[in-house]
Structure formats: structure tokens, C-alpha cells
Amino acid sequence: VESMPDLNQHNPHLMKYLTQNSIWWIEYSGIDGIRMDTHPYVFFDSMAEWCKEIQNEYPDFNIVGECWYNTEAGSAYWQENSILDKTRNSHLKTVMDFPLQGIVREAFMSQTDSWTGLNKIYDRLALDFMYSDPMAVLTFLDNHDTDRFLSEEPDNLGFFKQAIAFLLTTRGIPQIYYGTEILMHGNKKESDGLVRLDFPGGFPGDKVNDFIAADRTPLQNEAFDFIQKILKWRKGNE
């Protein structure tokens, strides 16, 4: 669509409705978290109050804000208790680590020297001091709005395993985009739809069912088993 309607969230009656509506859906569905799309697009104070009210009602609930900035300063500004602006508080527990995501593919696919490769990751993590809570930052290799981590089907899983191991053992809250476990690949060059294809299997007309090992290729099973092993290890450790 060319445009979307705006709601005046400075209207207290509207904000009360939006907050009550959110609480109703959380209670009804039993979810434990919300990803708030384009979080910074709305009035800062309105979103801060919404986050605060939700957290007061559900202290263990998490809200992930899509704050798409290519710098740590841009992302960290929106996290609760930000050191970058102590005059106000967003009450947003988790922001997305787009600065790290933006360089992670190049970091693992290029040779490491003084400026490239894994040094790019070091440079990003060295700026963690900007976040009020780096452990609450959402880390990811890709999602529905970016190119997939794999632009094409790999011949081997060397750099892929390194990237997965890093994602699941570094600081923060890891997010794995569906299909990563079976090496789904593609980019947005022609269409966003190319990175949002259906997961093969379980749908009418699908020729393969990648939900089961028998239908996956040996390389897909290797990737699937590797991710599963690290996730089991992660789940069993603090």
C-alpha cells in the first residue's frame, strides 16, 4: 500500500485501548513475547508507556523492538535505561542487533586480517558498552527483511557452522530464521518473497517434506543436526 493510517497515540483514550487490547491478546494467547515492528516510528513517550504497562502486568514478558539502525548508538538509544539519554526511559527490554547482523556474513566468509574477517565482529562487540544490557540484545544472522545468510546452496558447511556456533554462544538472545536449519537461501534482489518462501513439507503439493530427516539431503541433515546439538547444549547451560 502507498500509505497506512496513523493513530494519534497522544490521545489517552486511544492509548488505554491499545494497551488493554495488547493485554487481552497476551492473556488469551499465552505468548511470552512480542516483536514490535518499526518501534521508533511511533511517539517515544507513547511506546514507553505502553512497554511499561505491559511489563507491569507481565514482569517476565519480553518486548523486542525492531529498531533498525546500522550503528550501536542508534540501537542502544532505544533500549531501556539507555546511557545515551538519561532524561527519559523507553522501558524496552530488547532491541535488535542490526549493526552486528549487517557484517556477520562478510566476517565469516572472508579471511581474517587486520581489518576484515572476524575483526569486523570484534569491532562491533567492542561497542557493547553503549547498550544498557548487551545480554538482552537480539542477535540474528538474517530475517524476513534481509537477504538470507546463505545467498546460494553451499558446497560445505565450514563458514556456516562457524556463524551458527557464534550466534548461539555469543552474548544476547539468538534468533534463528526459519529454514536456516535446512540451508534455505536467497536474497531480496528481485523480491522479498525470495527470502520468505514456504518451508518445504506439510503443505499440499509439496514434493518433499523437510520436517523429516528422510526427505532432507545429507548436507541439510548435517546442518540440522549441528544446530540441534548446540541448541541442546545451550538449553542445558546457564
List where the protein language model places each region.
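Acidic/polar loop patches that form or flank catalytic/metal-binding clefts of enzymes
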Residues: G65, G172-T180, E238
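Chitinase-like catalytic core of GlcNAc-active glycosidases
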Residues: V1-T19
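Conserved interdomain hinge at the start of the Helicase C-terminal
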Residues: F160
